């Protein structure tokens, strides 16, 4: 995850680029693949307007024309909604998919998270109809926000078998959900990559 640095109240683009160059150099040194994640929680996705969100992607492409990246998207303008509306994700989705060589991380939202498992599955599937880039689903546990719930095994399986979802990210502090995900994907031979930070560790 790339931290969007600020200086005097504005994004510090030189430090942003330097951070990614340092990460890439470290990955190259150790012989591992590193794909930067932009505009997620460390990128202040919930605080960026659409113009600044797009500018982060533009600045990355100016400095790294061929680098694969992952960008988080969330529901825009949903704070007063009483029902889940998949189209709230469309604005940021379109900004990401204007770029090549990227993946879209569909970050959870209160409206999506509070649905029962079957309707939650349907909500993700609705968003997937607009995907032209590979999709990654995202879950939180309630240690982060009180309304969050990790995926039940049935829901994880339903998302993992969707052809447009290549993986899933779970953010955990209290439970080893990432290990549950990895075990299910391995045992069922699912073509779906579990992702996690080191939150639980």
Task: For every predicted segment, state its role.
Residues 1-150:
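Active-site beta->alpha loop and helix N-cap motifs at the rims of alpha/beta catalytic domains
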Residues 130-137, 141-201:
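Catalytic alpha/beta core domains of metabolic enzymes, predominantly
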């Amino acid at each position: 995850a790339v931290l969007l640095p600020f200086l005097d109240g504005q994004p510090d683009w030189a430090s942003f680029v330097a951070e990614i160059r340092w990460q890439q150099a470290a990955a190259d040194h150790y012989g591992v693949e590193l794909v930067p994640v932009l505009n997620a929680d460390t990128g202040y996705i919930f605080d960026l307007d659409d113009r600044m969100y797009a500018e982060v992607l533009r600045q990355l492409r100016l400095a790294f024309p061929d680098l694969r990246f992952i960008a988080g998207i969330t529901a825009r303008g949903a704070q007063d909604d009483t029902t889940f509306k998949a189209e709230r994700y469309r604005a940021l989705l379109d900004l990401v998919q204007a770029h090549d060589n990227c993946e879209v991380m569909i970050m959870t939202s209160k409206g999506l998270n509070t649905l029962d498992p079957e309707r939650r599955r349907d909500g993700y599937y609705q968003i997937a109809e607009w995907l032209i880039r590979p999709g990654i689903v995202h879950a939180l546990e309630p240690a982060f926000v009180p309304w969050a719930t990790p995926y039940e095994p049935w829901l994880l399986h339903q998302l993992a078998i969707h052809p447009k979802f290549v993986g899933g990210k779970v953010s955990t502090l209290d439970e080893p959900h990432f290990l549950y995900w990895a075990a299910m994907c391995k045992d069922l031979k699912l073509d779906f990559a579990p992702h996690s930070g080191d939150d639980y560790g």
